[in-house]
Amino acid sequence: MNRLKILKENGHLIPVILEVPEEADSVVIMVHGFTSSKECPTGQLLIRRMPEAGMGVVLYDQPGHGEEEAKEDPFRIENCMDSLAAVEKYVQLKWPEKEIFYFASSYGAYLTGLYLERRKHAGTHLLMRSGAVIMPWLFLGAPGSEPDSEALEELNKKGYLMLGLTGTRQVKVPKGMFEDMMLPENDLYGNFGESDHGNTRVAMVHGEKDQVVPVKFAREFAEKYGLPITVFEGQGHSLSDDPTCPDKVADLAIDFFK
């Protein structure tokens, strides 16, 4: 396992972990979720499972996340896309003969969905794990809901909010990210079907008891855009309430990528 830094065009660095056996015929790029990092349990799962299945793994920190340089890169949608593009470019240049897959969780799945729509990309498959297909709602509230006046006052005063899911570290979310979420083109739930995703195959896996992104929305998204979805009964957003579930998700990913 190797570690390195990738320099972005905006001058920020992307910390990366690599586990790519020479004999691997493909590389899985993990795109982590909100408040997570490359060091997350899902990354460890992929490092453990993918190489033995003939796939390399690349883990990286998204802007505003992790404990290294990436946390200084503002957490904005275009910045996040730029990081994914830089990591993907590195993989293409380093291993031009290897196929690229995306394994993306929660916000990472939302971001990668937007990336497929708007950026030239090389990945042939995307697995959306607990995909936050309604991500703008999680930041702004459901359509028609009233904003939190205290949070809005703090945002306008400080220019950012510190936010996090229960039990996770908080992330600095700049005012610009809330503005990003208001843009119609960043509504993945409404816009994902407007292209062929660059010939990238997409599948979903979700927990039936997901408390962050209710499975109702995942099922509706899958039906709306003709995507296969696997729902694990009794599982929450992390898909790890049952200790055997992470490996079941890995099995599903391996089958999908193959």
Predicted regions and their residues:
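N-terminal cap/lid segment of alpha/beta-hydrolase-fold proteins
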Residues: 1-21
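Short beta-strand element of the alpha/beta-hydrolase
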Residues: 25-33
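Short beta-to-alpha linker loops that shape the active-site pocket of alpha/beta-hydrolase fold enzymes
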Residues: 34, 61-71, 132, 235-236
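The serine-hydrolase catalytic nucleophile loop
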Residues: 35-47, 62, 216
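Conserved alpha/beta-hydrolase
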Residues: 47-69
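Catalytic nucleophile-loop/oxyanion-hole region of alpha/beta-hydrolase
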Residues: 65-95
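Gly/Ala-rich beta-loop-alpha elbow adjacent to hydrolase catalytic centers
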Residues: 103-112
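The alpha/beta-hydrolase serine catalytic core
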Residues: 110, 121-220, 224-231, 236-257
